Curated annotation (Swiss-Prot):
Domain GST C-terminal: residue ranges: 90-222
Gene behind this protein: GSTU17
Membrane in keyword set: no
Disruption phenotype: Delayed flowering, long-hypocotyl phenotype under low fluences of far-red light and insensitive to ABA-mediated inhibition of root elongation.
UniProt source species: Arabidopsis thaliana
Keywords on record: Cytoplasm, Detoxification, Growth regulation, Stress response, Transferase
Induction behaviour: By dehydration stress, auxin, abscisic acid (ABA), jasmonate, ozone and transition from dark to far-red and red light.
InterPro entries (UniProt xref): Glutathione-S-Trfase_C-like, Glutathione-S-Trfase_C_sf, Glutathione_S-Trfase, Glutathione_S-Trfase_N, GST_C, GST_C_Tau, Omega/Tau-like, Thioredoxin-like_sf
Entry protein name: Glutathione S-transferase U17
Domain GST N-terminal: 4-83
Length: 227
């Protein structure tokens, strides 16, 4: 399949755009990456996703698919015979992967993002408490899902790995910005080892943003709160 048949509208710094990029790499699907300029929305984006007007959007034979996790599922279904399965085959495991993916987006990432916006010490303490609780939940989820293997999905990166792993670059940037170890090996050893394995995977490394570059970008969109 030619890359012109598959296009992805996105931006290099977006963790949500990383999700379909990793999925496409896992499935060895060539694609054209159409980068949006931060702070503006192209006509193609507005036309392709008129409801939410957000990235990412996958264009497959000019048909748009929106929302990062939905795109990942679409990629897994469409190229089911290529590469490892992204979603678990067992219905219960599949349901659990979707449950934790929703938790990550609705709770865990909200807390992580709040760290960069937090002003006073009390606000930071509240965010730390939320993240530590979330990390403990995810540590147990990893142990339950991985069954002793390197990834949530077992031997290969899967749906839940992508859902959480896409935020690791932003997690590193946040740790530098607030001088606090969010993913602590002493508290979450299994999750910390998983993060190392995930970042070193050949499907992930080419699309993982460089920490220094992402840190500079973060300064533009998350100015330090005024004292």
């Amino acid at each position: 399949m030619a890359s012109s048949d598959v296009k992805l509208i996105g931006a290099w710094a977006s963790p949500f755009v990383m999700r379909p990029r990793i999925a496409l790499n896992l499935k060895s699907v060539p694609y054209e990456f159409l980068q949006e300029t931060f702070g503006s929305k192209s006509e193609l984006l507005l036309k392709s996703n008129p409801v939410h007007k957000k990235i990412p959007v996958l264009l497959h034979a000019d048909k748009p698919v929106s929302e990062s996790n939905i795109i990942v599922e679409y990629i897994d279904d469409t190229w089911s015979s290529s590469g490892p399965s992204i979603l678990p085959s067992d219905p219960y495991d599949r349901a659990m992967a979707r449950f934790w993916a929703a938790y990550i987006d609705e709770k865990w990432f909200v807390a992580l993002r709040g760290f960069l916006k937090a002003g006073g010490e009390e606000e930071k303490k509240a965010v730390i408490a939320q993240l530590e609780e979330g990390n403990a939940f995810l540590e147990k989820a990893f142990i339950d899902c991985s069954k002793g293997k390197p990834f949530f999905n077992g031997d290969n990166i899967g749906y839940l790995d992508i859902a959480l792993g896409c935020f690791l670059a932003w997690l590193r940037v946040t740790e530098l910005a607030v001088s606090y170890k969010i993913l602590d090996e002493a508290k979450t050893p299994s999750l910390s080892k998983w993060a190392e394995n995930f970042c070193n995977d050949p499907a992930v490394k080419p699309v993982m943003p460089e920490t220094a570059k992402l840190a500079e970008f973060a300064k533009k969109i998350f100015p330090k709160p005024q004292a």
